[in-house]
């Protein structure tokens, strides 16, 4: 981590494997030391750079990132190229100190009294600059290939369109297993023990795991969904302590007692098993039977009365029909008589009768 009391170092003059550090004391600002560490002598003019030695003779560093087309960027080719060049540079850098390379002052060296940089003999060897171009290439090639944020050399990411089979699977699974948000855990009791506090959290995890879906191949059968534990209590038991027949659905419906038979157990074919046994000699059973008999008698009397009333209406309507039929026959006979009378009269009398009417 960088400290707030340090300053950026000035650009380093070119160095070679045969060039020793200048005899003058470096300035504090040039090597990033805090102010006030010692008197800052005026900077001496840098020594004239000597031509590079034989080791670094053919090494150059050219930034070609601006000339590379991102569309034509080949990851494998550049990876092999950079790795091969880096191996060569590291081998040359390792052979550099053996060939007579000296120690150079660097910003990370410890400062002695007066702000001067101490030699490498007292505090271990500094990082070897076997040759300037080798270190420079190592520093340039790493970010050139490894950095991803560079806009010019960003690796190409080929977008793959989703296949129709995957979309069909996802739609089918989404229809079979609709997502349901897990119920929130109930608030813990203020005086509950740790065991009581862990139970709601466990139920919440089970409920959350019950909502997960499985992606299977089309040929495999679809498993049933994981049952989610219900926060409601178990379905009510029958009158005799047995669960009602028909499963949990009938148990949740809640059986209604029959007023006629007086049963209070579950419904269906096994209603008699869940019915409470009643003593036939008790007064309660006798009163219930008497009420049932009275209700049956009333219903039978009402049915008989409705039948009698219906028969009376039928008789009345039949008599009215006969009477109307006789009336129709009488009117038909009178019509025939009047027609015979008009046929017997002459036409002159008919004309006179029509004139008088006019």
Curated annotation (Swiss-Prot):
One GO-annotated biological process of the protein: cholesterol metabolic process
Effect of residue 301 to A: No effect neither on interaction with TFDP1 or TFDP2 nor on transactivation activity or repression of E2F1:TFDP1-mediated transcription, no effect on cell cycle inhibition or adipogenesis
Location of the region described as Interaction with FOXO1 in the Swiss-Prot/TrEMBL record: 240-358
Residue segments, region Required to induce adipocyte differentiation: 126-200
GO molecular function: chromatin binding; chromatin DNA binding; DNA binding; DNA-binding transcription activator activity, RNA polymerase II-specific; DNA-binding transcription factor activity; DNA-binding transcription factor activity, RNA polymerase II-specific; DNA-binding transcription factor binding; histone deacetylase binding
One Pfam assignment: bZIP_2
CDD domains with a match to the protein in the record: bZIP_CEBPA (cd14711)
Biased composition (Basic and acidic residues): 276-292
Job description of the protein: Transcription factor that coordinates proliferation arrest and the differentiation of myeloid progenitors, adipocytes, hepatocytes, and cells of the lung and the placenta. Binds directly to the consensus DNA sequence 5'-T[TG]NNGNAA[TG]-3' acting as an activator on distinct target genes. During early embryogenesis, plays essential and redundant functions with CEBPB. Essential for the transition from common myeloid progenitors (CMP) to granulocyte/monocyte progenitors (GMP). Critical for the proper development of the liver and the lung.
Other remarks in the entry: The V296A substitution has little effect on the binding of CEBPA to its consensus site (5'-GCAAT-3'), while greatly increasing affinity for cAMP response element (CRE) sites (5'-GTCAT-3').
Assembly description: Binds DNA as a homodimer and as a heterodimer. Can form stable heterodimers with CEBPB, CEBPD, CEBPE and CEBPG. Can form stable homodimers (also isoform 2 and isoform 3 dimers) and heterodimers with CEBPB (with isoform 2 and isoform 3) and CEBPG. Interacts with PRDM16. Interacts with UBN1. Interacts with ZNF638; this interaction increases transcriptional activation. Interacts with the complex TFDP2:E2F1; the interaction prevents CEBPA binding to target gene promoters and represses its transcriptional activity. Interacts with RB1.
PANTHER family: CCAAT/ENHANCER BINDING PROTEIN, CCAAT_ENHANCER-BINDING PROTEIN ALPHA
Protein name as it appears in the record: CCAAT/enhancer-binding protein alpha
